[in-house]
Amino acid sequence: MSQSLLHSTVSDFFDLYIPNSNAVRDIAVAVSGGADSLALAHLLNQKVSSDLSHIDLHVLTVDHGLRPEASDEAEHVGSIVSSWKNATHQILKWDGRSAETGIQEKARNARYDLMREYCEQHGIKFLFLGHHGGDQFETFFIRLSAGSGPEGLGCMAPVSVQNGLNLCRPLLYQSHEDLVSYCQREDIAWCEDPSNEDDKYERVRYRKAYEVLSSEGLSYKRLNKTLERIRQMTESAHVFSNEKYDELLIKKETDRILFNLECIKALPLDTVCRIVKRAIEELSDERGYGPRTEKTEILTKDLLEGKGFRKRTLGKCIFEVLDDGEKFSVSKE
């Protein structure tokens, strides 16, 4: 892909998703030091410098402290950004060495938490991320293999909103190779992560399957179009299930939610699954994706079959039928 097409990709993204960019004063971009995020940061800086000079670009690098070279890589990003107009670099630090288990997930959560806090403090509403077509491909097949439901299979949208912050991904139709070539042409030195070639990681194994599947017609463009349809159908189902949730809600307390069970049994399986998931989310104090779809479906099927639903737990909540089958209760464990 030519440089002009990549520049057009970023410009088109602003036109489509940030049409009021004249009112925007600051944007941020997450940069690890790899080719993907550095290419995106450079493209954004070019856009800001040429067309949106009123916008300041905040380049954010999180130093997890998990690898000896992490600090050097963060400083390397700063040395590159120091020569750019309209751009500043910030290193956000998190000490991951104190985490004994689930280090990768905790590091990912910490990364987003630190960047979100920075954006809140500086009034930034748009955080750009360097996810590309290859990342989308890997994410889809990882989630498919794990049995994800429609929400999970929708993968990454060009823009998603979390706690008022717009997460922007303009490169979902581009390849890693496109971005490496861009860095080479612009003489941008990037850092290589050895784990990107290590077969012990699930993502790497799926990445190597792309060559075969792309030869059968599964391009990044075709995959993203399919995922867009999945997200549209999911949103419609989400709106409908929320309407039914409110209609069938009998009582909501701090630690318990009661529903009209007779009316619940008249709903489709997918809708009831969504009601169950929302109840868990509203009672849960923990972050995360919640119970696996398969487990939620098993509970929901048993509830709808009406053959003596047994009290059970799921997602740290207790599910039981009360008052001779008239009410369905979800309470904190």
Predicted features by range, described:
Residues 129, 194, 198, 222, ...:
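Short, surface-exposed helix-loop/turn micro-motifs enriched in polar/charged residues
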Residues 207-222:
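Conserved anion/nucleotide-ligand pocket segment
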Residues 136, 205, 222, 271-275:
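Residue-level detector of well-ordered alpha-helical segments, enriched
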Residues 3-36, 54, 58, 94-96, ...:
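AMP-forming adenylation/ATP pyrophosphatase catalytic core
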Residues 63, 223, 255-257:
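Solvent-exposed, charged amphipathic helical/linker segments at domain boundaries
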Residues 2-209:
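Core alpha/beta nucleotide-donor-binding catalytic domains of modification enzymes
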Residues 196-203, 221-232:
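Internal, active-site/partner-interface "lid" segment
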